[in-house]
């Protein structure tokens, strides 16, 4: 089944996205939130079920176990994972191949980290990265302009071998452009 991970920078926006998805027909169990606080009811229930299922198998510490529980639930149940940047590190989501950046961070490495959650060893499909941009919003346009300039700098120093660079510049994934060559 198709899985999608959506990244945003704030918990408020995370909750807004979840509410909008529910309005379109997604059920509560289809949508999973990850923000590093592990304080909502659903996350606590998922963690308790994971503990029962994995009793005696692992003792990584609470934070790591919560991450394992979230990833396990996403892999087997939920269709959409909505993360703050707390989810841009330490999650292995190679079973998911669609990354949506709802808002763009100032730091291009954060975009790399977000995409890297899915674009990793074991991924069986091309990873599609979608960067949303509100062109009517001056702040969003400014962030995009700054990111574009930073990616141009990286291109000059490291070469244009970056998935995020291709996705950000033209909306076409880097792999797709290579296949067209």
Region roles according to the model:
Residues 91-104, 128-131:
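A short beta-strand element within the Helicase C-terminal
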Residues 15-20, 43-45, 94-95, 112, ...:
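A short acidic (Asp/Glu
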Residues 11-13, 38-40, 87-89, 105-108, ...:
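Conserved nucleotide-binding/hydrolysis micro-motifs of P-loop NTPases
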Residues 68-71, 82-96, 115-123:
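SF2 helicase motor core recognition
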Residues 26, 117-127, 156:
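Arginine/glycine-rich "motif VI" loop of SF2 helicases in the C-terminal RecA-like domain
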Residues 125-181:
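C-terminal accessory region of SF2 helicases/translocases
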């Amino acid at each position: 089944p198709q899985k999608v991970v959506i990244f945003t920078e704030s918990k408020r926006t995370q909750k807004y996205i979840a509410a909008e998805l529910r309005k379109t027909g997604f059920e509560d169990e289809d949508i999973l939130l990850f923000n590093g606080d592990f304080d909502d009811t659903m996350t606590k229930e998922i963690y308790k079920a994971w503990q029962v299922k994995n009793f005696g198998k692992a003792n990584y510490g609470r934070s790591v176990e919560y991450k394992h529980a979230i990833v396990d639930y996403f892999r087997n149940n939920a269709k959409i994972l909505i993360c703050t940047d707390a989810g841009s590190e330490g999650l292995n989501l190679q079973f998911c191949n669609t990354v949506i950046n709802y808002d763009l961070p100032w730091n291009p490495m954060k975009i790399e980290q977000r995409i890297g959650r899915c674009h990793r060893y074991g991924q069986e499909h091309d990873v599609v990265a979608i960067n949303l941009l509100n062109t009517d919003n001056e702040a969003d346009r400014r962030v995009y302009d700054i990111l574009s300039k930073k990616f141009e700098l990286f291109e000059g120093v490291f070469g244009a071998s970056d998935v995020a660079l291709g996705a950000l510049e033209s909306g076409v994934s880097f792999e797709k452009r290579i296949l067209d060559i």
